[in-house]
Amino acid sequence: TIGIPGTFSARLQPNDTRDDVQSIAAQIYEGLSFGVGDAVIGVNPVTDDVENLSRVLDTIYGVIDKFNIPTQGCVLAHVTTQIEAIRRGAPGGLIFQSICGSEKGLKEFGVELAMLDEARAVGAEFNRIAGENCLYFETGQGSALSAGANFGADQVTMEARNYGLARHYDPFIVNTVVGFIGPEYLYNDRQIIRAGLEDHFMGKLSGISMGCDCCYTNHADADQNLNENLMILLATAGCNYIMGVPQGDDCMLMYQCT
């Protein structure tokens, strides 16, 4: 049902500073009790290796399978780690990767297009999802500039290029992590709100299933009112999904969210 009129979904984000599976499971249960997690249950891992990723995926799908929950899991490690884990038998849901609007920017993330091609092929063969859309991308204004990979273009133009790349792979979901770049590129709450609405608009124009991580870093000129205001604006504008984090405070990524 994600993306249909009147549906506002959420990614459940049960991160833990130690990748402790008991903590992750407890956060999953809490989030589900609020109806959060219909877009994806996605963990940002501390340790990016196949064994840890498989352990966390097993935890996520242990809950999904026990209660027959109509959602999908994801561990947001590097795309190559996810591919290897799934090929070794880990339960596959969505395959994730952060993307950038230039080849140089992708290389800064350690990514080549061939990896995304392989991820789509592996997802089509192994992933436990109902449809064909098996990829999950994250973006955000300023990433290309911070990597010196914008070639003189402004951050909105570079962000628009992200959505063109994402559309090529027909992903299940895409979201901007709008304030995570910090005040060096989006200084305060007004700039973050503007960027969130810009990204939503560009994503929708690109025809992709667009969401937004309404967030800010602790050194930005912003507070939790920003996240709530942007969340309401995006819901009114038809955004597909946002994030769900315990108390809006991600203890692993060290930023403030919804």
Residue map of PLM features:
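Anaerobic metallocofactor- and corrinoid-dependent redox/one-carbon enzyme cores
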Residues: 1-25, 33, 38-258
